[in-house]
């Protein structure tokens, strides 16, 4: 039985108005998601340029679209509200962040929130968290992602320079990426925090306990230093495990580019993550280390100026700011995927340093 042929036959028999509806609906969802990114970008721009409440109008527009938004964006808005001493908006935006998966243990992720427990608003924040509607994430998918990531980490930890173990590791990671493509990317989604929740220490520890696993990296770190990393995993406000395996491959981006962009348009991948995958596919993987991979790096547009200049690399993705035409290209590439302007990101870095407002520039990978 030719399932593909039958499927095509069925589609050809669908009324035109139904086909038009699904096409229009898909385009509408994508447009709403891009509107969301643009409102968030404009809100950040207004703040770093003016440091006044004018940004809140754009934040509110973003959170009232029918797009799938990210807890980190509402958390950024809450930080700005705290800086501007607007308690009402602090509570409003934290409520939105909690409703979209911000763990309470991540509340103090930003320096500006480090001493929030001593602030008179803190009891109200606790009340908001306790009373708001918490999201439901796919725990079954999360367990499967975590389990595959654990197995990949374990193979990597023990492989050393053993060629057979290295081959076993690369083959396993290939199968992991195939799983992500078949089960998620091919359907326009990616198992990020909007599907499986923000990664937290407590959730990962619970997973390890239920599956009877021991993290070799954490065990070694504890043996050498007496403790593990003191920075909580949830401080990154991402679900990093499924993203890590894509970063490890030079071919993830070239092979899955269109599918990854669909995930961005559907709210299952942040624009900066898409850009980071593009840049790292060129900058981090300039030699084919995996014999099972075969692809050509997409260098021509791999310029977002996320990564810095690396003198050890023969091919750079960093454009010098003195290169006027090159910087126009950077801004064009960023705008095409809904990413913040490079010029505004530079101002955000200044505010992050001086004001303690965390803008979450980098994906955190162990």
Model-flagged regions — what are they?
Residues 35, 42, 76-77:
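Structural register within alpha-helical repeat arrays
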Residues 1-36:
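Bacterial Sec-dependent N-terminal signal peptides
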Residues 53, 63-70, 84, 88, ...:
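Preference for long, solvent-exposed alpha-helical segments and helix-linker "stalks"
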Residues 37, 71-75, 106:
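Start-of-helix register in tetratricopeptide repeats
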Residues 219, 225, 230, 235-239, ...:
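Extended alpha-helical interaction scaffolds used for oligomerization/partner binding
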Residues 282-366:
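A cross-kingdom marker for long, charged
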């Amino acid at each position: 039985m030719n399932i593909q042929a039958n499927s095509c036959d069925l589609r050809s028999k669908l009324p035109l108005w139904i086909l038009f509806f699904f096409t229009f609906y898909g385009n509408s969802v994508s447009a709403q998601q891009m509107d969301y990114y643009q409102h968030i970008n404009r809100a950040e721009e207004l703040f770093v340029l003016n440091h006044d409440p004018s940004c809140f109008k754009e934040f509110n527009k973003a959170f009232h679209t029918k797009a799938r938004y990210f807890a980190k964006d509402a958390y950024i808005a809450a930080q700005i509200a705290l800086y501007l001493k607007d308690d009402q908006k602090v509570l409003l935006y934290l409520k939105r962040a909690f409703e979209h998966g911000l763990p309470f243990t991540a509340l103090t992720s930003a320096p500006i929130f480090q001493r929030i427990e001593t602030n008179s608003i803190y009891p109200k924040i606790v009340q908001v968290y306790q009373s708001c509607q918490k999201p439901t994430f796919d725990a079954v998918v999360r367990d499967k992602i975590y389990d595959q990531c654990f197995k990949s980490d374990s193979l990597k930890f023990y492989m050393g320079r053993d060629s057979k173990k290295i081959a076993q590791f690369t083959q396993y990671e290939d199968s992991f990426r195939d799983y992500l493509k078949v089960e998620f990317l091919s359907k326009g989604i990616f198992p990020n925090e909007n599907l499986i929740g923000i990664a937290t220490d407590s959730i990962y520890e619970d997973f390890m306990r239920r599956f009877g696993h021991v993290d070799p990296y954490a065990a070694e770190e504890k043996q050498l230093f007496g403790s593990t990393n003191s920075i909580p995993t949830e401080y990154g406000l991402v679900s990093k495990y499924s993203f890590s395996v894509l970063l490890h491959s030079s071919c993830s981006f070239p092979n899955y580019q269109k599918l990854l962009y669909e995930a961005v348009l559907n709210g299952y991948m942040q624009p900066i993550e898409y850009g980071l995958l593009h840049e790292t596919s060129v900058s981090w993987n300039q030699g084919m280390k995996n014999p099972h991979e075969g692809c050509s790096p997409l260098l021509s547009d791999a310029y977002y100026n996320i990564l810095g200049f690396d003198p050890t690399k023969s091919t750079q993705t960093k454009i010098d700011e003195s290169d006027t035409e090159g910087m126009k290209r950077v801004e064009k590439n960023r705008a095409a995927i809904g990413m913040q302007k490079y010029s505004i990101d530079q101002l955000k870095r200044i505010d992050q340093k001086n004001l303690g407002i965390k803008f979450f520039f980098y994906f955190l990978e162990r």
